[in-house]
């Protein structure tokens, strides 16, 4: 074997070794676990943690610590979800100069056992894990092989970038530049979060009213078996452009506990009035209140459905909610609405199909005819039209509790409650909606109010049996604005007419008292 051949063979071996180490870093299966607040969080204080995650997501280890006058205090160590800032980092290194709380992440089993601060490159770790001194031979080999390894790493990194693009990893979510809380991170666990009372229970868990420092927040707690719903909701909230006044305000996400005792938390803004369902059960609404709720609800759904390129924080894809109902619309103190609960939501990105997404999801009562039939066209517009059918039913719920018309206001009922009761089966809904093509009743007295008559027409165009004939959320928003303007004009004209009639009356002259 010639000298050139030997050299090529050596470079090949080094390249393979480098490739193995680089590709191996993404195979993080276990991390060192530590929680300084273990007593309060009711978890283990230290040990190891198995990292769970989807096959197409990368897993990392992380560490957070404080440096108080040269004394290192570890706050948390454990597993960390897919984050581009952690890719291909075998060492857990903080690069900021002097943060209040140091944070680093890395790839590789137990890579967070030791952690570093890059300006000084000092190893900061528990006293039980002393730094091991590298032998001189190791340093000699390292410095001599650096040039060759750099070339090998560049080649392999280029190949990895090509594969990364080809396999179409989900886009990494960067923090939005809109004002508001930072994206979810383990540092949220440093703030005292106290659960106060259960406010609601649903398919994927329960919602608590909680106290975060001086702020009242909502905490949605998922059991570990509903991790996919928690992860999907977290990813939807973290998309660029999702900070909107009519979409529930997202604060952060956390994993509490270990192994089978793990709970998954989503922390959002808290709204005391609760859901639209709860509000309509206890209250009637005026015409102006109906318009305010309906307009802001439509505005939130329109923003969710919209594909918006060129935002400062990236491209916002169109998102279908897939579980629109009055229970998932929350009311703020001023009665403006915000859309909540994205556990079933689906995002649509250019060049990607909906794939194997199961179409028959959501709440049966609000399922569109095509969903009940299982005849869904798995394209973006089809899913958005399914949302609009359910939106029409929510508008009907609002109309049923409005005092604008002269007729009586009925007790609150869910859509189709008269026909199928409170717990319909899939077959019940198929019979009523698909075969009989029934819809909730639009009262005759509603037609006598100009605004309510236009609202009834809008509702019918939202729940049309032909999906392609349904209105968009943006169109509904514009219609509601026009409805309110029209009724204001009519009211003003009526007042002018009455005043004119009164001023044109010939009153008899007053008799003199003299």
Curated annotation (Swiss-Prot):
The keyword Nucleotide-binding applies. Its EC number is 2.7.11.30. GO terms for biological process: activin receptor signaling pathway; cellular response to growth factor stimulus; pattern specification process. It is found in: Cell membrane. It is an enzyme of class 2 (transferase). It catalyses: L-threonyl-[receptor-protein] + ATP = O-phospho-L-threonyl-[receptor-protein] + ADP + H(+); L-seryl-[receptor-protein] + ATP = O-phospho-L-seryl-[receptor-protein] + ADP + H(+). This is Activin receptor type-2A. The gene is acvr2a.
């Amino acid at each position: 074997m010639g000298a050139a051949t030997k050299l090529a063979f050596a470079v090949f071996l080094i390249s393979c070794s480098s490739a193995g180490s680089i590709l191996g870093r993404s195979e993080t299966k276990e991390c060192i676990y530590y929680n300084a607040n273990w007593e309060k969080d009711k978890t283990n204080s230290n040990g190891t943690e198995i990292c769970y995650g989807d096959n197409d997501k990368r897993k990392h280890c992380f560490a957070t610590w404080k440096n108080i006058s040269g004394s290192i205090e570890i706050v948390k160590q454990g597993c960390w979800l897919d984050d581009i800032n952690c890719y291909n980092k075998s060492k857990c290194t903080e690069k900021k100069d002097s943060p209040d709380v140091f944070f680093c992440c890395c790839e590789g089993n137990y890579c967070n056992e030791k952690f570093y601060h890059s300006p000084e490159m000092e190893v900061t770790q528990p006293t039980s894990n002393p730094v091991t001194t590298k032998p001189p031979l190791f340093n000699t080999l390292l410095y001599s092989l650096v040039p060759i390894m750099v070339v090998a790493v560049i080649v392999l990194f280029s190949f990895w970038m090509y594969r990364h693009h080809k396999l179409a990893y989900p886009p990494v979510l960067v923090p939005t530049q809109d004002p508001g809380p930072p994206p979810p991170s383990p540092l949220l666990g440093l703030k005292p979060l106290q659960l106060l009372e259960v406010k609601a229970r649903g398919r994927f868990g329960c919602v608590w009213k909680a106290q975060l420092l001086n702020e009242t927040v909502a905490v949605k707690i998922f059991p570990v078996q509903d991790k996919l719903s928690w992860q999907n909701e977290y990813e939807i909230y973290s998309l660029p452009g999702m900070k909107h006044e009519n979409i529930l305000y997202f604060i952060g996400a956390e994993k509490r506990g270990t192994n089978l005792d793990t709970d998954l938390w989503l922390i959002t803004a808290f709204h005391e009035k609760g859901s639209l369902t709860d509000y309509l059960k206890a209250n009637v609404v005026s015409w102006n209140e109906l318009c305010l709720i309906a307009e802001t609800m439509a505005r939130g759904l329109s923003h969710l459905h919209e594909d918006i390129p060129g935002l400062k924080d990236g491209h916002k894809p169109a998102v279908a909610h897939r579980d629109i109902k009055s229970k998932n619309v929350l009311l703020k103190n001023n009665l403006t609405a915000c859309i909540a609960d994205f556990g079933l939501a689906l995002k649509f990105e250019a060049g990607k199909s909906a794939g194997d997404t199961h179409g028959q999801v959501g709440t049966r009562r609000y399922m569109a005819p095509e969903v009940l039939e299982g005849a869904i066209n798995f394209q973006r517009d089809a899913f958005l039209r399914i949302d609009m059918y359910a939106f029409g039913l929510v508008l009907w719920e609002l109309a049923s509790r409005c005092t604008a018309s002269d007729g009586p206001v009925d007790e609150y009922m869910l859509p189709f409650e008269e026909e199928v009761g409170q717990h319909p089966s899939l077959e019940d809904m198929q019979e009523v909606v698909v075969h009989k093509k029934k819809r909730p009743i639009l009262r005759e007295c509603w037609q006598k109010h100009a605004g309510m008559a236009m609202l009834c027409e809008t509702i019918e165009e939202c729940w049309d049996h032909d999906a392609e004939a349904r209105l968009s959320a943006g169109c509904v928003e514009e219609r509601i604005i026009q409805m309110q303007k029209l009724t204001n004009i009519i009211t003003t004209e009526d007042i002018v007419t009455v005043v004119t009639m009164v001023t044109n009356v010939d009153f008899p002259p007053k008799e003199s008292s003299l």
